[in-house]
From Swiss-Prot:
<keyword id="KW-0716">Sensory transduction</keyword>
<feature type="transmembrane region" description="Helical; Name=4">
    <location>
        <begin position="140"/>
        <end position="160"/>
    </location>
</feature>
<keyword id="KW-0552">Olfaction</keyword>
<dbReference type="InterPro" id="IPR000276">
    <property type="entry name" value="GPCR_Rhodpsn"/>
</dbReference>
<keyword id="KW-0325">Glycoprotein</keyword>
<comment type="function">
    <text>Potential odorant receptor.</text>
</comment>
<dbReference type="GO" id="GO:0016020">
    <property type="term" value="C:membrane"/>
</dbReference>
<dbReference type="GO" id="GO:0005886">
    <property type="term" value="C:plasma membrane"/>
</dbReference>
<comment type="similarity">
    <text>Belongs to the G-protein coupled receptor 1 family.</text>
</comment>
<keyword id="KW-0297">G-protein coupled receptor</keyword>
<keyword id="KW-1003">Cell membrane</keyword>
<feature type="topological domain" description="Cytoplasmic">
    <location>
        <begin position="288"/>
        <end position="312"/>
    </location>
</feature>
<dbReference type="GO" id="GO:0007186">
    <property type="term" value="P:G protein-coupled receptor signaling pathway"/>
</dbReference>
<keyword id="KW-0807">Transducer</keyword>
<feature type="topological domain" description="Cytoplasmic">
    <location>
        <begin position="219"/>
        <end position="239"/>
    </location>
</feature>
<keyword id="KW-0472">Membrane</keyword>
<feature type="topological domain" description="Extracellular">
    <location>
        <begin position="79"/>
        <end position="97"/>
    </location>
</feature>
Length: 312
């Protein structure tokens, strides 16, 4: 349908977190430490992986990638949210809104793909230990990492294009604390059914395929672990995988709640989105370091000023 006298929207107003008027200062004081911990925790893991030669393995290569994307994912939405909680402008330009939506889904989908690759890495290490160095050589690791970036870029480009090729002529108040598909589409001045269906299918398909591949890897891993005769060997193998499984559960729960509900609950979606944007990226460093002796040793050496070390 052709739209006449369309006054194109050049900026949006982020209405923020619903039902929190008057609590902005409290929320700022609450959220700022979460964001700071996310940055410090993920930088610490990245420095540990780079500086410790013991951690120059495929598993830690992908963990370092995950730390970078966790910092980026949280930084896409949190700084703007913290600014408006401080009483600064809630305005976001059209171009910045497009960028925010693109990078949110770009980094978020990369994490899904990366969890899948990390599950395959654990499968190769536990089920094929003798061939592990061949299966996961440096070229394959780099190819898998680049593959996750390219897939994430394609996935996000589709979602962003579908959302912003629609005309936005009237209301510009986004009932959310950042630009995301469920909050932006209701403002469009045209039929959004196609964009909604494709977005639902795209997010659902990516999540489902990644989840099934992870499930397949861990089914094979479980069968392999149960065949280990040594109790100590079984415990060590399960311990290696448990951190990854906890991180996967933390990542997939919010995706299902926010994007794959037949009738979304806006308030529930906002709460879960905050947990996904703030708490999830902060938890990953804790999940991986608290259960990982090698990372803890590397961090202790860095803290004691033993920086880049070649460890025997």
């Amino acid at each position: 349908m052709e739209i006449k006298n369309c006054s194109v929207v050049t900026e949006f107003i982020l209405l923020g977190i619903p039902h929190t008027e008057g609590f902005e200062t409290l929320l700022f004081v609450l959220f700022l430490p979460f964001y700071a911990c996310t940055l410090v925790g993920n930088v610490s893991i990245l420095v540990a992986v780079i500086s410790s030669t013991r951690l120059h393995t495929p598993m830690y290569f992908f963990l370092g990638n995950l730390s970078v994307f966790d910092m980026g994912f949280s930084s896409v939405t949190c700084p703007k949210m913290l600014f408006y909680l401080m009483g600064l402008s809630r305005l976001i330009s059209y171009q910045d809104c497009v960028s925010q939506l693109f990078f949110f889904h770009f980094l978020g989908s990369i994490e899904c793909f990366l969890y899948t690759v990390m599950a395959y890495d654990r499968f190769a290490a536990i089920c094929h230990p003798l061939r592990y160095s061949v299966i996961m050589n440096s070229k394959i690791c780099v190819a898998l990492a680049v593959g996750t970036w390219l897939l994430g870029c394609f996935h996000s480009s589709v979602l962003t294009s579908l959302t912003f090729t629609l005309p936005y002529c009237g209301p510009n108040e986004v009932d959310h604390f950042f630009c995301d598909i469920p909050a932006i589409l209701p403002l469009a001045s045209a039929d959004t059914s196609l964009a909604q269906r494709v977005s639902f299918t795209n997010v659902g398909l990516v999540s489902l395929v990644c989840f099934l591949l992870i499930l397949l890897s861990y089914t094979r891993i479980t069968i392999s672990i149960l065949s280990i005769q040594s109790t100590e060997g079984r415990q060590r193998a399960f311990s290696t995988c448990s951190a990854h499984l906890i991180a996967i559960l933390c990542a997939y729960g919010p995706i299902i709640t926010i994007y794959l509900q037949p009738t979304p609950n806006p308030m529930l979606g906002t709460v879960v989105q905050i947990l996904m944007n703030l708490v999830g990226p902060m938890l990953n460093p804790l999940i991986y370091t608290l259960r990982n002796k090698e990372v803890k040793i590397a961090l202790k050496k860095i803290l004691h000023g033993k920086g880049s070390v070649s460890e025997g």
